[in-house]
Amino acid sequence: YLPEEFPAEQWDLVMKINLDHVWFMIQRSLQVMLKQPTGGKIITIGSMASYFGCTTVPAYTATKGAVAQLTKSVAVDCAGRGININCICPGYMDTEMCANMTQERKDECTKRIPAGRWGLPEDMKGPVVFLASAASDYLNGALIPVDGGYLVK
């Protein structure tokens, strides 16, 4: 949709799913983790849209930018309390979400990815395992792009 045509009910739905539910998950997780002697790790999912505006998807772009900033805000509030929160930001992924893209558009996007391919859901495993492990204990409030180098080009 163009911004002037974006339906209000669609906006509300995307906000609920992509932002409100993330916030409530963080809140509930903190309520449990703050009672644990070991604290915990929270991993949010942003998008490359957390870094820049995307055409025809204003609600999606707004929510992913908000998730990135929410992650940073909570990281500041939880620093020193034994809880780390970081955000993984996938680039173009071969998932259902992009299934309706034309092949021409997919090819156009692929040309901008230095890795020369779209990500696969399996490409998210490494960052998730790292962020959930003790190896990331000093990492807090970070946005981790998983995008085949898209953002550096």
What spans do the regions from the language model cover?
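Short, small/polar-rich loop/turn modules that mediate ligand/substrate recognition or access, typified
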Residues: 79, 84, 139-141
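Active-site loop immediately N-terminal to the catalytic Tyr-X3-Lys motif
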Residues: 4, 52-58, 80-81, 116, ...
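Active-site loop-to-helix junction immediately N-terminal to the catalytic Tyr of the SDR YXXXK motif
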Residues: 1, 6, 53-61, 73, ...
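Residue(s) in the substrate-gating loop at a strand-loop-helix junction
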Residues: 47
